[in-house]
């Protein structure tokens, strides 16, 4: 059975914007690569490699509390779900192979059954991981069967609610990823007020991270480059949703010029 939905036949088509998952597949974590199917097949066999850590072998169910390498970064990546996108991409590229879609859907709902209401869990709801996971959950909307779609929307709404909560918001690049997640899910849910709030907060965060000349407050040179790419991705997401940036975009380009001067 082909689990990749025909969105034109859905009763949900007016309540959400299915253009969002299509156009928000931007950035290196969310775009296809030649090795996608090989990696996805490995994951379905129970092999998960979260760089730079060694391979982890899991059974028929993912052990969400696992910490095999005693590494916070590993558990962060596990709960961020960015590793799951290779399965989503393979499911959408090979709809005749329904096992990929089933795995993606099962993983999303399995995680949600355990952690959706455990918002104080120190790992599952880590800042930045929550924003990245939200993006992944939105991008796979076409894979969710009709009989699970209402529950799926509840999962997204809960993520949107938590990302919109100022008390859970952090600064820096972690906050940047939280706000990108909020922008994407608000756009998908057609929540224009929340979408505008995410955009406003993104610009506010940018203004707190960059001075008027486009210099980032992060001291390390490597982070100047990372921040440029992260912010460029965020600005791309805003523009994909029809939000113009004006002076903020120009200041980001100025920061790129500063970086070029540093490395001369």
Language-model features: locations:
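Extreme N-terminal leader/anchor segments
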Residues: 1-58
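Alpha-helical protein-protein interaction elements
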Residues: 4, 21-22, 56, 66, ...
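Short alpha-helical hairpin
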Residues: 47-65, 74-79
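Aromatic-lined, polymer-binding surfaces characteristic
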Residues: 61, 71-252
